[in-house]
Curated annotation (Swiss-Prot):
Its job: Participates in various redox reactions through the reversible oxidation of its active center dithiol to a disulfide and catalyzes dithiol-disulfide exchange reactions.
Name this protein carries in UniProt: Thioredoxin Asp f 28
Keyword Nucleotide-binding: no
Positions of the record's site feature: Contributes to redox potential value: 34-35
Residues in Thioredoxin domain copies: 1-108
Keyword flag Transport: no
Family that this chain belongs to: Belongs to the thioredoxin family.
Database matches in Pfam families: Thioredoxin (PF00085)
Annotated PROSITE patterns: THIOREDOXIN_1 (PS00194), THIOREDOXIN_2 (PS51352)
Top-level taxon in the UniProt lineage: Eukaryota
Paired cysteines (S-S): 33-36
Matching PANTHER family: THIOREDOXIN-LIKE PROTEIN 1 (PTHR46115)
Protein species of origin: Aspergillus fumigatus (Neosartorya fumigata)
Entry coiled-coil feature ranges: none
Length: 108
């Protein structure tokens, strides 16, 4: 279901490696989630626009341990990382405008 330069992650170890440095956007989604499917092409466009930011996608049903560890309660949920640390604020739902504003804050 990934679009653009979004990396699908299905392993907790790879997740840890990909979020350990730099600016990262993590899209927690589920294949059965309508809003997730609707927003995926827009996230793909953002991944092309912000090429200095790593975009990864985590299927909460396949990588339950990461979803649990990150306390994901709704999909889609976007968690942004800067220098290996998750930002406290998250984007829950398909608000692409809010997501892009947060991406700008980590990509500078």
């Amino acid at each position: 279901m990934s679009h653009g330069k979004v990396i699908a992650v299905d392993n907790p170890i790879i997740y840890k490696a990909l979020t350990s440095s730099g600016p990262v956007v993590v899209d927690f989604f589920a294949t059965w989630c309508g809003p997730c499917r609707a927003v995926a092409p827009k996230v793909g466009e953002l991944s092309e626009k912000y090429s200095n930011v790593r975009f990864i996608q985590v299927d909460v049903d396949k990588v339950r341990s990461v979803a649990h560890e990150m306390n994901i309660r709704a999909m889609p949920t976007f968690v942004l990382y800067k220098d290996g640390q998750p930002l406290e604020k998250r984007v829950v739902g398909g608000n692409v405008r809010e997501l892009e504003e947060m991406i700008k804050s980590i990509s500078a």
